[in-house]
């Protein structure tokens, strides 16, 4: 499996990286994402940098972007109070609160986060972004990419921005609020009719 992933991310034009950027978050859901440390260590030993870590970072950041879109779009205070810190946590590389607490709960935000991660990973691959160490992703991952910080920041913006915009436009509808509004309108119409 790991050899297959190594082969995949080595495909030209960032094709494999795009795929792995999309599928990284599902491996977090499955709980097997720590296996990628072997890829990091292998690439560090062979090339002096790891090209895998930026892909994982893009995927994590994107889930944060999707979660923040939900946080800003919802009027449900319970969801908002959970989504805001979860988005920040994801941007620091810890995605479980965002994925399990928000994005998977609503489904589409998770998918939009995967798409955002794919585009961020594609950019990282095309620009040859590599990290000089392993162990930290998200905002603090830039400390491992000081050889090319501008590309890391652009990758962050692309992954986060794509996931945020896609979730805002297509990935989340504040259904609870809509249902309450429709319910109030229905009661109002009924009262008017009875009068």
Enumerate the predicted regions with their spans.
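Juxtamembrane interface elements at the cytosolic ends of transmembrane helices
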Residues: 1, 35-37, 166
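Hydrophobic alpha-helical segments of integral membrane proteins
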Residues: 1-12, 22-26, 40-44
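Alpha-helical scaffold segments in soluble metabolic enzymes
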Residues: 3, 67, 164-168
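Membrane-interface elements of multi-pass transporters and channels
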Residues: 4-8, 12, 30-34, 47, ...
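Membrane-interfacial loop-to-helix junctions in multi-pass transporters
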Residues: 5-19, 30, 49-55, 75, ...
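Transmembrane alpha-helical segments and their short flanking loops
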Residues: 11, 39, 85, 97-195
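Residue-level signature of the transmembrane alpha-helical core
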Residues: 18, 22, 26, 57, ...
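Helix-loop-helix junctions within the multi-pass membrane cores of secondary transporters/permeases
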Residues: 37-116
């Amino acid at each position: 499996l790991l050899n297959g992933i190594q082969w995949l991310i080595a495909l030209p034009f960032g094709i494999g990286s795009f795929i792995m950027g999309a599928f990284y978050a599902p491996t977090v859901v499955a709980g097997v994402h720590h296996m990628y440390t072997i890829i990091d260590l292998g690439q560090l030993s062979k090339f002096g940098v790891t090209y895998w870590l930026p892909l994982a970072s893009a995927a994590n950041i994107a889930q944060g972007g999707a979660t923040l879109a939900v946080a800003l779009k919802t009027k449900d205070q319970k969801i908002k109070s959970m989504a805001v810190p979860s988005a920040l946590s994801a941007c620091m590389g810890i995605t479980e609160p965002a994925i399990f607490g928000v994005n998977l709960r609503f489904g589409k935000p998770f998918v939009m986060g995967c798409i955002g991660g794919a585009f961020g990973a594609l950019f990282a691959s095309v620009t040859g972004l590599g990290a000089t160490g392993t162990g930290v992703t998200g905002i603090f991952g830039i400390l491992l990419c000081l050889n090319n910080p501008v590309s890391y920041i652009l990758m962050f913006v692309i992954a986060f921005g794509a996931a945020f915009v896609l979730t805002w436009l297509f990935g989340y509808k504040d259904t609870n609020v809509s249902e309450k509004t429709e319910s109030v309108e229905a009661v109002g119409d009924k009262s008017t009719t009875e009068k």
